[in-house]
């Protein structure tokens, strides 16, 4: 693994496309999600420790609630739990107009587009949330394609959403570079056959990014 100090996977590059996760990579949204999750869990009498909650970073909402339902024996149907949580998230994000893009992410996207890279989002979030959040931070139209976790059978850390992104891009996974902030996401991209940049975001919790090929703390490392 190469550290941020010697990071240069795009200079020169074997890649034709860059595939971004969204939350914690493009938008600094994980703290808001943690807050919504704590409130949702509390309504069912559940309190998770920090490490337990951080373990869900990168997985789909459906997979998170399936695990919670099984672990704590919740009675409501999974569909009901998921629908209520999705409504809460969409309402909170729509109201939270101060959500910020990750520093330098917009500049990095422009840098990639000027150099002819195809760019994609591969997020575990529902498609409606992806569109809403990317629109809020001003980069929805910058992406060639979007792949959502609700469109595939298996959530991260399975590779499904990254394979879907590569298919829609028309680029082999081996020619895509993925950018992820979570352990689950890094594992998913690696399983898809992509090389991976782990983006170290302290707001995403204590994430083990060591399976990534490179680890960075800011996007200026790319633009060399």
Per-range role (PLM):
Residues 33, 37, 41, 61-68, ...:
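Hydrophobic alpha-helical core bundles mediating ligand binding, dimerization, or RNAP-core interactions
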Residues 46, 117, 194:
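Short phosphate-binding/catalytic loops that engage adenosine nucleotides
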Residues 3-55:
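Active-site neighborhood of HAD-like aspartate-dependent phosphohydrolases
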Residues 26, 101, 119-122, 154, ...:
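Conserved SAM-binding loop
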Residues 40-78:
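Alpha-helical substrate-recognition element adjacent to the catalytic core
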Residues 2-16, 110-113, 126-224:
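Asp-based, Mg2+/Mn2+-dependent phosphohydrolase catalytic module
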Residues 47, 69-110, 115:
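Metal-dependent phosphoesterase signature
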């Amino acid at each position: 693994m190469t550290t941020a100090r010697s990071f240069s996977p795009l200079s020169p590059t074997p890649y034709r496309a860059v595939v971004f996760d969204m939350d914690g990579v493009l938008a600094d949204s994980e703290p808001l999600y943690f807050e919504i999750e704590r409130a949702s869990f509390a309504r069912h009498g559940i309190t998770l420790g920090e490490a337990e909650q951080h373990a869900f970073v990168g997985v789909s909402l459906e997979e998170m609630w399936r695990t919670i339902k099984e672990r704590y024996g919740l009675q409501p149907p999974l569909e009901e739990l998921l629908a209520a949580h999705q409504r809460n998230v969409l309402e909170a994000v729509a109201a939270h107009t101060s959500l910020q893009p990750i520093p330098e992410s917009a500049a990095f996207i422009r840098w990639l587009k000027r150099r002819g890279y195809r760019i994609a989002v591969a997020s575990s979030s529902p498609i409606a949330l992806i569109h809403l959040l990317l629109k809020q931070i001003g980069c929805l139209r910058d992406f060639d394609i979007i792949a959502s976790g609700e469109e595939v059978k298996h959530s991260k850390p399975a590779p499904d959403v990254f394979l879907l992104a590569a298919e829609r891009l028309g680029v082999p996974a081996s020619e895509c570079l993925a950018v992820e902030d979570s352990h689950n996401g890094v594992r998913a991209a690696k399983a898809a056959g992509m090389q991976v940049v782990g983006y170290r975001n302290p707001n995403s919790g204590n994430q083990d990014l060591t399976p990534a090929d490179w680890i960075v703390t800011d996007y200026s490392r790319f633009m060399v």
